[in-house]
Swiss-Prot record:
Class in the EC hierarchy, top level: oxidoreductase
Sequence intervals crossing the membrane: none
Described function: Involved in the biosynthesis of branched-chain amino acids (BCAA). Catalyzes an alkyl-migration followed by a ketol-acid reduction of (S)-2-acetolactate (S2AL) to yield (R)-2,3-dihydroxy-isovalerate. In the isomerase reaction, S2AL is rearranged via a Mg-dependent methyl migration to produce 3-hydroxy-3-methyl-2-ketobutyrate (HMKB). In the reductase reaction, this 2-ketoacid undergoes a metal-dependent reduction by NADPH to yield (R)-2,3-dihydroxy-isovalerate.
Residue numbers binding substrate: 414
Record's protein name: Ketol-acid reductoisomerase (NADP(+))
Keyword NADP attributed: yes
Binding sites annotated in the UniProt record for Mg(2+) 1: 217, 221
Keyword terms, alphabetized: Amino-acid biosynthesis, Branched-chain amino acid biosynthesis, Magnesium, Metal-binding, NADP, Oxidoreductase, Repeat
Domain (KARI N-terminal Rossmann) ranges: 15-208
GO biological process, one term: isoleucine biosynthetic process
Highest taxon above the source species: Bacteria
Residues the entry annotates as binding Mg(2+) 2: 217, 389, 393
Amino acid sequence: MANYFNTLNLRQQLAQLGKCRFMQRAEFADGCDVLKGKKVVIVGCGAQGLNQGLNMRDSGLDISYTLRKAAITEKRASWQKATDNGFAVGTYEELIPTADLVLNLTPDKQHSDVVKTVMPLMKQGAALGYSHGFNVVEEGQQIRADITVVMVAPKCPGTEVREEYKRGFGVPTLLAVHPENDPKGVGMAIAKAWASATGGDRAGVLESSFVAEVKSDLMGEQTILCGMLQAGSLLCYDKLVAEGTDPAYAGKLIQFGWETITEALKQGGISLMMDRLSNPAKLRAFELSEQLRTLMRPLFEKHMDDIIAGEFSRGMMADWAEDDAKLFGWREETGKSAFENALAFAGKIAEQEYFDNGVVMVAMVKAGVELAFETMVASGIYEESAYYESLHELPLIANTVARKRLYEMNVVISDTAEYGNYLFANAAVPLLREHFMPTLKAGDLGASKAEGQNVDNLALLAANEATRNHPIEKIGQVLRGYMKDMKRIAVGG
C-alpha cells in the first residue's frame, strides 16, 4: 500500500491539510438520530473503544463488540471489559455482517490486519469508522468502493470521554469523511451522529480531514504533548539532584509540576500560566522560553517535515516489522531512568510552590506549545486544529505523568505516540543538556533564590504583550469558550 498523502498532488495536499471548520451547534440538532435503529459494531475494547461504546449506548444506540475468537474463548481483558459492562460480544463472522457501522478502535498497529479481515464480511453499503486516520493516510489502506469511511476523533483519552459525558458535557472532537469513500454522500450525517452520541457536540466539533487530523496529531504528540514532557522531566530531575536537591522532593516537583502548571494553561492559556509567576520570574521565564524557541525550532521543524513526507511512518512501520525492537528498547531505557525510580516524597508541596520552583518548566511549556503551534500552521494546518493538538491536550497528558510518571504517560498514549515521543526526546535531551541546562541560574529550578528582584517596566510590558498577542492565545480564547464547563482534571500532589 502506498502512503495516501504522497499520492496527492500539491493542491490536493494543501486542501486537505487546510480543511478545518468549527461546526455550529445547530448542525447537531438531530443528535444521533441517523444511527438509531442501526447496528453499530465496535472492533476492540480498549480505552477509546469501551468508553465511546458506553456513551453511544447511553445515547440510545445499539452497540456490540466484536473480538478475535481467541480473545473470546480465552476470556481476555477485552472480552472481560465488554461483558462486565453488559455488551453483546461476538466473533467477526458473527457480528460484522450485521453491522451498519463498524468502528475500528484498535491500536494503529492492528488497523491494517483488522480492516483486511472485516472488509470482506461487511455488507454492501455499510460504513467504517476510525478515531485516528493513520491507517488510511500513512498506510494507504484501500477500502471497498461501496463502503463509507468516516472519522470521529475525541481530543482526550478515553477515560475523559466517558467522565465528561457522565456529567452532561463532552470533549472537543474532530470529524472527517474520507473523500475517496463517500459513495452515497451520507458520510457527514453518519460522522455527526457518531460525534453527537459520544457527547462531542456539547464541547465543540471541528470538521477536518483524515490528512489534517493525522499530520497534526502526530506532530503534537511527538513534540509538546509527550516528547517535551519526557525530555523536560529527565533533564529537570537530573539538574535538581546534581545541585543537591533531595531526590524524592525533585521527583515530586517534576511529577506533579507539569500537571499543576498546565492546569493554569487549560483555564486561561499561556497568559494565565505566566501570570502565576512573580514579575521577576515571569521575565526570566519569558527569556528562557525565547532561548528555547531559538534552540529547538530546527528539531520541531524536522519532526514536522518527516511527518509530512511520510518518513516518520516509514521508520515506525519498519520497527513494527522488527517486533517493535526500538520501541521496547527505548521503553526499557526510560524505565531505568533516575526520575522514574525516585522515591516518593512524603511532604506536601503547595500549589504555588510548583510555579515558584519550576520557572524553567513554565518556560519549557511556553516554548513547546508555541513552537508546535507555529510549525503546524506554517505547514498548512489551520490554527484551530493546531490548538487542539498542542495546548488543549497538554494538561491531559500531564495528568498521566502525575499518576505514575513517564510510565503511565507511555502506557496511556498510543503506540504511535510513544514511538514518536522517544524519537523527539532522544534528540532533545542531549541538545538541551549541552546547550541549555548549563545556562540556568539560581531561581530557575528548585528552591534556590534568584539574584536581584528588580523589574524593568518596559521589559515586563513587552513580555506580556508578546505572550498575549501570540496567535495561539487569540484562537484559544475562542475555543476555550466552548469548553468552559470542563472540570478540573488534576489528581493532586
